[in-house]
Amino acid sequence: MSVRIINGKVYKNGVFSEEELVLKEGKIVSAQDGDAEEVYDAKGNYVVPGFIDVHTHGGAGVDVNAADQQGFEKIGHFFATQGTTSWLSSILTDTKEQTLKTIKEAVKHQEAQKNGHENCADLLGIHLEGPFLSPEYKGAMPEHLLISPDLDLLKEYQEAAGGNIRYITVSPEVKGVPESIKGMIDLGMKVAIGHSGADYETAWKCINEGAVSATHTFNAMKLLHQHFPAIMGAVLESDIYCEAICD
């Protein structure tokens, strides 16, 4: 199906200007006038790509860790109304039994999406926030469930997910984390560092091993000090992505 969007403010060459767009099967095929089966008047609105939320624990009153299929549907529909068209399901550190249950529910929802989910954000995969995190900066994580890296456990989770665990948050100072990052990458996961009071050198070691992002930068993280740059200094000095809690 083709759609022509008219009168919207489109971001082009560094500025927003009123342009027309023609989309076919969800992809932009023209930034000029063109014929289409459907015309949408975006007057007074900005036209931007859908947002991709790589770290979210739910929405519309539904917690991912406790979500069933109806819950995942509710989250996806809510996100779509807010301009988020794709997302990762972030699983808080939980028991092995509950983590596997949540993984299976997420995978089931992904499979159901293949049959079409109108007005529902696309679930791209899973983000594991833990369990290889520092107790000192645990935030909302249950401390008794935080452990040192266990690649066999992670492999079991990834197999249950059918390879759909895309992203994992770890704390650099937890014993064994820097040495385990390449193993996590080999399992098909992007690695983020966070929930951490790591020193500058340890954080950089993780970045050099392949960590590509910082989880909710500034939050649950030791902040910059003139004599102790810590993880914050390494994150800001490097070229890794920085998540932000924007409220």
Predicted regions span which residues?
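Histidine-rich, glycine-flanked metal-binding segment
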Residues: 1-48
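Conserved beta-strand segments that form the floor/walls of ligand-binding pockets within enzyme
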Residues: 4-5, 22, 47, 53, ...
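Histidine/acidic residue-rich metal-binding segments in metalloenzymes
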Residues: 109-111, 147-215, 221-242
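Glycine-rich phosphate-binding loop of ATP-grasp-fold ATP-dependent ligases
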Residues: 136-145
